[in-house]
Amino acid sequence: MLHLSQPDRAPTRAASTSLDSPIAVAFVGTYAPRRCGIATFTVDLAAAVAASHRRVLPMVLAVTDPAGQYEYSSDVKFEIRQNSKADYARAAEFVNYSHVRLVSVQHEYGIFGGDDGGYILDFIRALRVPVVVTLHTVLKLPSPNQAAIVQKLFEQCAQLIVMSEVARDLLASSYGVRGPKVTIIPHGIPVMDRDPDQEALKAKFGVRGRRLLLTFGLLSANKGIETVIRALPAVVSQFPDLVYFVVGATHPAVLRREGEAYRTMLEREAEKLGVREHLAFRGQFVTSEELRQYLQAADIFVSPYLSEAQVTSGALSYAMGAGAAVVSTPYWHAQELLAGDRGRLFPFKDHVALSRVLLDLCGSPVELNAVREAAFAFAHSMAWPRIGDAYFSLIRSTLRAAPQRQAAGVPREPAAASSLPELTLNHLLRMTDDTGVIQHAVYSVPARRTGYCVDDNARALIVAVQADRVQASPASRALVVRY
């Protein structure tokens, strides 16, 4: 019979609540050089929190996608393979046996393994330190499983962070999650110069003396770039010096699946409309410094997303911080950030309305400058130093309220158990029928003639319960009920 011994418990680790001692914080998410928005966010957040208090010691647990092999910096102390369930358990052990006092998780359904990224729950459940979770996506109509995952995150974490008021409202209406554990901290942006030499930056990009329209971000079909291209003929007929830059590489997942089909379609659309010479693709992944220069060179930033279901946009926040005049479709985050004449909105997919907005701004330098001034003044509150301070304040209050917690499930699940490969119950299932576990087998074939005995079924029940605690599955739960 298979026997799962109860290993020794991990030693208890005292948790200091003093903020005079080092505060090791583990940041979990994708990380540079991986090319995705959350990777950039994790880099910036870790640096901002470390800068906010001299005793903060950041470390990173980087989530790696199946196709990725990255040369991470020394900040990364542990690598979690996205689809390896065992890696999440090992990562929790690493944290529990380290000096980490708090974990900050960057949550997006698609970056973690399991159904809708459910493996992250295994990681959080096994931790013995407080956890704060930042939600990068909050859906209006989540699937039952997506809603359940966020509800479990809420139950298991000390604080759930969202980046906008609309995200907080959606948590309440679509997930049933509300209360003081939900905190709003905006998306951070770099500190940028108030009055850059815009013409010098334009000269660097070969467009000195021209009006620069800009969109940036990883390219994919949901970005709505075709709406802007279709608006160009009406605009360039009156302002022939205008050029539209589309800055950013094609999203890696899209590139693997479709290649450059979307970019090719956009180029053909521009050719057909006779505006190809007014369109320039900068199809590479840009550094933070290059991005700053592009944004500060731009006169108008266009965010033409096709769907309202966008509770946060780092690109939109960055553009406002650079002092660009922002024109956007009315997705949720844009409605919130651009209220109070901090930008201009136009309907989804409506290139005619967009052309009117662009003509108004290009034809009125006073209005254009007023929009830029309002955006820049508002964005000051989202600068990374302020966001780092806000996160540190939350970390400090969390540590004071809950310096240590007990891992859920089996008390302090040991390293030996969770480091095992995924448990296979095939033989035990084969040895079990509607009555219980059969007493003997010939090699792997159940010997039904030998019947059943109470002590074997009692031991089988113990094994099934322990298996369900260590690596829960429908099979282990079925065996518990059977025995």
Residue spans for each PLM region:
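Acidic donor-binding loop of glycosyltransferase active sites
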Residues: 158, 278-284, 293-310, 324
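Conserved donor-binding/catalytic core segment of Leloir-type glycosyltransferases
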Residues: 27, 207-223, 229-232, 245-247
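Low-complexity, Ser/Thr/Pro/Gly-enriched N-terminal "stalk/linker" regions
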Residues: 408-459, 463, 470, 474-483
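A short helix/loop element that forms part of the nucleotide-sugar donor recognition site in Leloir-type
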Residues: 194-207, 212
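Nucleotide-activated donor-binding/catalytic signature segment of Leloir-type glycosyltransferases, i.e.
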Residues: 257-285, 289, 435
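Conserved acidic donor-binding segment of nucleotide-sugar-dependent glycosyltransferases
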Residues: 340, 344-351, 360-365
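Short hydrophobic beta-strand element within catalytic cores of glycosyltransferases
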Residues: 320-321, 325-328
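Carbohydrate-associated surface elements
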Residues: 166, 188, 250
